[in-house]
Regions:
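Transmembrane-helix boundary motif in ABC transporter permease subunits
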Residues: 4-35, 50, 97-99, 104-105, ...
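Non-cytoplasmic
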Residues: 55-56, 132-170
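Interhelical loop and adjacent transmembrane-helix boundary motif
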Residues: 152-192, 196
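Membrane-helix interface segments
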Residues: 23-31, 59, 74, 104, ...
């Protein structure tokens, strides 16, 4: 689920970060502050408001129900919850990368007739790839470790919406510390190996 959440985060977050870095929008500061609220708000608060949106009585939930699509307390809700919790990390990191690019390079591409979409893919993204990669890894690790938002929106349903943090919590509650320790070690080991691999890849590409 963390992988799907990261794909969703990249799809929405990278273009959003570029727009925030390169475009002057009305209410841009308010939008930036709103997008960064997941970094400071308690996960249960985020989960509550998200549930109010996607639940059966929520605005999004009602629209989806008209198409016989259930979102709350399904695996899709777990993916959405993890994406919402990690979205701000990718946006902030990628935005910093885009802002560090020399404007003249993008302006040169524009004078050659490239569209904004073409400039984004052929100039901005290649030059900011390190920041995008760093943000992707951070958001993936955040999605992998999400607990509060997922519990509020998707529940703790074994075989459906239960994630590794939720499983660890359940094992601790059941006093099954051996399984809790095993999952915790797997989680820590995976994240450490991932960080080492990404660091090595970044050095090779330098």
């Amino acid at each position: 689920m963390a992988s799907l959440a990261t794909v969703l985060t990249i799809t929405v977050g990278v273009p959003t970060a570029w727009i925030l870095a390169r475009r002057t929008l009305p209410g841009k500061d308010l939008l930036s502050a709103t997008l960064l609220t997941p970094l400071v708000l308690p996960p249960t608060v985020l989960g509550y408001y998200l549930l109010m949106l996607v639940g059966r009585r929520g605005v999004i939930g009602r629209l989806l129900s008209a198409w016989n699509i259930e979102l709350a307390f399904t695996w899709r809700a777990a993916v959405l919850a993890a994406a919402v919790g990690s979205f701000a990390l990718l946006i902030k990191t990628a935005q910093t990368g885009f802002e560090s690019i020399d404007h003249r390079l993008e302006q040169a591409a524009q004078t050659l007739g490239h569209s904004d979409w073409s400039i984004f893919w052929t100039v901005s993204v290649p030059l900011a790839w390190r920041s995008i990669l760093a943000g992707t890894v951070l958001s993936f690790c955040r999605a992998l470790g999400d607990f509060g938002i997922t519990l509020m929106v998707a529940g703790d349903i074994p075989g459906s919406t239960q994630t590794m943090p939720l499983a660890i919590y359940d094992y601790v509650q059941a006093n099954d510390l051996s399984r809790a320790n095993l999952l915790a070690l797997v989680s820590v080991g995976f994240v450490v190996l991932l960080m080492l691999a990404v660091g090595r890849f970044a050095r090779l590409r330098y």
